[in-house]
Amino acid sequence: MVQTITYGREQEIPLKHPRETGKPSIFNDQKMKLGLFGSNCSGGLCMTDAPTTYEITWDHTKSIAQKADRLGMEAMVPVARWKGFGGNVNFNGTNFETFTWAAGLAEATDQITIFTTTHIPTVHPIVAANMATTIDHISGGRYGMNLVMGWFTPEMHMFNPSQLEHDERYQYGGEWLEFVERLWTAEGEFAFDGKYFQAKELESEPKPVQNPRPVLINAGNSSAGTDFSAKYVDINFASLDLEKMPDYTQAIKKKAQEEYRRQISTMTYGLVVCRDTEEEAKRDHQRIIDEGDWPGARHLMSIIGVESQSFGEQIEKFQERFIAGWAGQPLVGTPEQVVDGFQRLSDAGMEGMIMGFLDYNEEIDHFGAEVMPLMREAGLRY
């Protein structure tokens, strides 16, 4: 473990679980926590030309976040993107940078936990620590960081012509995060001496509102990814078939407890297409696929297949789910059917789901009016 040196002496800083602060809404006791995913970038979770009023403007993204906040949702999680995926629509190519996006939404909302998504190779730990702390103060302790190792090589080459091998990216990420955590917790000046980072006379003030640190999440599902999550983060987001979720959840919780003496929870993500009738829902879901950006999808899947072990052999099976939902869990149907889907996820060990919609600003109103009451009736929300 990298040692922190403070005023010439070694200092071990115990890291408590952020749940102990009781502040961020993502740690409340709702049985099925809810959030929005990808509402900062073009297409959101839909790689398609299907018609939508969704657009990347500040007023639009702020309206979406404020609606989620008023509904009592727990999380706003953005997608960090520096380069689109080409094809017909250049999926995610137009986007808001996530730290500044989160700072704005932190001021514009009241209770929802606002996340950044951080491609670790693109930002130095000193800069990341202070930016994160600033957002935590703006939000009053409602900030969280989604940690991504930088899997999209053409994008990462915009910053550095070399790309670390998959497992080493997680080693780099672990050291990066330990550096950030020391900046969040160390009192006085200290030195950091690691494999990837070396620095002296370090300090960072103020400290985050959350004690000892903000919420951390990660979506690594490979062996290296789950080990990183078990060791460092509070929530792991699983991109898996439903039947694999119970064993996955049990395994990662066991690893966190037995190897690192920590707690971790599991959540998932996906696309929700909820309509008044099943026929309408299936029709609109199929339209997303039929009008999908298949050249862009093939480009994306080939890159993921080669460069991200989190998906591996699942790529062909998830082909349509990349078009409609970024390979996440599809919940398609009437409000009752969507709630049944949430129930199945809960039964499989998922404590929450962050969602995308084809049309976030319009569909979240319908979700609030038709789905949320049924979730309360089902005991998934209160």
What positions do the PLM features span?
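Active-site mouth loops of central-metabolism enzymes
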Residues: 45-59, 117-126, 162, 210-223, ...
